[in-house]
Amino acid sequence: MARYFRRRKFCRFTAEGVQEIDYKDIAVLKNYITESGKIVPSRITGTRAKYQRQLSRAIKRARYLALLPYTDQHR
C-alpha cells in the first residue's frame, strides 16, 4: 500500500521576513488569487493568519485601484 506524501505548507512571508505586504506588488498578489479572481484561502497556501489578512487587504486595494481585475472574464 503506497502512502501519499504531502509536502508541509509554510508561510512564504514569514520565511522571507516580510513586514508588510504591498498592494503595488502585483507579481506576488497574483500568486494568491485563482484564475477566476478569488482569493486563495490560507489552508491551501499555508499563509499565516497575520499575513493572510494583509494579503486580502492588499488584493482588495489593488482591485479598487484597477491594478488587479475583480474577475477573469468580463462579459
Swiss-Prot record:
Keyword Manganese part of the UniProt annotation: no
A GO cellular component annotation in the UniProt record: cytosolic small ribosomal subunit
Record function comment: Binds as a heterodimer with protein bS6 to the central domain of the 16S rRNA, where it helps stabilize the platform of the 30S subunit.
Top-rank lineage group of the source organism: Bacteria
Oligomeric form and interacting partners: Part of the 30S ribosomal subunit. Forms a tight heterodimer with protein bS6.
One MF term in the entry's GO annotations: small ribosomal subunit rRNA binding
PROSITE patterns: RIBOSOMAL_S18
GO biological process: translation
Similarity field: Belongs to the bacterial ribosomal protein bS18 family.
HAMAP family in the cross-refs: Ribosomal_bS18 (MF_00270)
Name of the protein described by the UniProt record: Small ribosomal subunit protein bS18
Keyword RNA-binding: yes
Alphabetically ordered keywords of this record: Ribonucleoprotein, Ribosomal protein, RNA-binding, rRNA-binding
UniProt-listed InterPro entries: Ribosomal_bS18, Ribosomal_bS18_CS, Ribosomal_bS18_sf
